[in-house]
Regions:
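Electropositive, glycine-dotted interaction segments
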Residues: 90-215
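Short catalytic/ligand-binding loop motif for oxyanion handling, primarily in non-cytosolic enzymes
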Residues: 20, 44, 55, 80, ...
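Conserved P-loop NTP-binding catalytic core
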Residues: 29, 47-101, 109
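Short, solvent-exposed loop/turn segments at secondary-structure junctions
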Residues: 16-18, 29-31, 40-41, 76-78, ...
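Extended helical coiled-coil dimerization/tether regions that scaffold
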Residues: 2-4, 27, 155, 163-293
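Pre-Walker A-like glycine/lysine-rich segment at the N-terminus of P-loop NTPase domains
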Residues: 2-48
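Short, well-ordered loop/turn elements at secondary-structure boundaries
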Residues: 5-7, 29-31, 40-41, 65-67, ...
Length: 293
């Protein structure tokens, strides 16, 4: 059965590192899969293979998988099945065949993003599958009128502030599952205040895209030249009010764009003061490395 949301149904991988031939049937699962095994058995290789598959589907000029696979998933009421054998793709959407070129323009048949979060020390996943997309993204973002899409997103502990802000940007009365996750899993009751630090020099070098529009809205100014302060502190309610024109995905996208360019950051750092369930007040920097991961 097809659905609007992306749902992985079947995956077969052949001859990728120590994976000679493995099949997964996800069709009767609830959307969350846990892989359990000894060190060195290939768990991380499964994540790498999935990343390789979609990296090759988004832009083959940036990456080409070097193994055979079959993947089937549902998205936007479509059933998509893709197989790669050698260098030859076979693609069908609702049992209708498409060439790789034809499929590439079907924006409704690929997930908007593949997001990876890896807590290990190895940088292989990032460097091989996510860095090429990130590098391409960063090279254009500063002068772009609109924020470009980044299909392959790699999250690590340095994105913890963005991740927490995005979660608490949701309306907890509507999204009860997110409220319960923040309260029961993260043990965080509330974000007490948020401080954004800017780089005024870099701000003036950027095009007037969504990143600068956000900065202007937060500071209640009409133009960047009149921006005098290099930081602003707001409550969570103030942030939500000033950025009410944004959805949660847009907030994440804009904050990611503002904070990630190594040499061109508009927002150089984000400080969060958190109220825990037990009433303690801590800063985000007080979280241990394990908690951030």
């Amino acid at each position: 059965m097809a659905s609007n949301n992306f749902r992985l149904q079947y995956l077969k991988i052949e001859n990728y590192k120590n994976i000679k031939c493995v099949e997964f049937d996800f069709s009767n699962k609830n959307g969350v899969t846990l892989l359990i095994g000894n060190n060195g058995c290939g768990k991380s290789n499964i994540l790498e293979a999935l990343s390789s598959i979609f990296a090759g589907l988004y832009q083959s000029r940036l990456h080409k998988p070097d193994f055979d696979y079959i993947i089937r998933y549902s998205i936007n009421n479509n059933i998509v099945e893709i197989s790669l054998s050698g260098s030859s793709y076979s693609i069908s959407v609702n049992n209708k065949s498409f060439s790789k070129t034809e499929f590439s323009v079907r924006k409704d048949c690929l997930p908007k993003n593949v997001i990876a979060c890896y807590s290990g020390e190895s940088q292989r996943l990032w460097e091989k599958y996510y860095w090429p997309y990130y590098s391409n993204y960063i090279s254009t973002i500063k002068k772009s009128v609109t924020i470009p899409e980044l299909p392959m997103i790699y999250i690590n502990r340095y994105n913890i502030e963005i991740a927490l802000l995005t979660l608490f940007f949701y309306d907890f009365d509507t999204f009860e599952d997110i409220r319960e996750f923040c309260a029961n899993t993260l043990k965080i009751k509330h974000i007490q205040d948020i401080t954004l630090h800017y780089n005024p020099k870099k701000i003036r070098e950027w095009n007037d895209n969504a990143v600068l529009q956000m900065v202007k809205m937060l500071n209640d100014v009409d133009g960047v030249p009149v921006l005098s302060a290099d930081k602003i502190t707001l409550s969570l309610d103030e942030l939500k009010s000033k950025l009410s024109y944004m959805g949660e995905r847009e907030l994440f996208k804009v904050l990611y764009a503002a904070t990630m360019p190594k040499d061109d950051k508009v927002i150089t750092s984000i400080e969060l003061n958190l109220e825990l369930n037990n009433g303690d007040l801590i800063s985000c920097s007080d979280l241990s490395e394990g908690e951030k991961k």
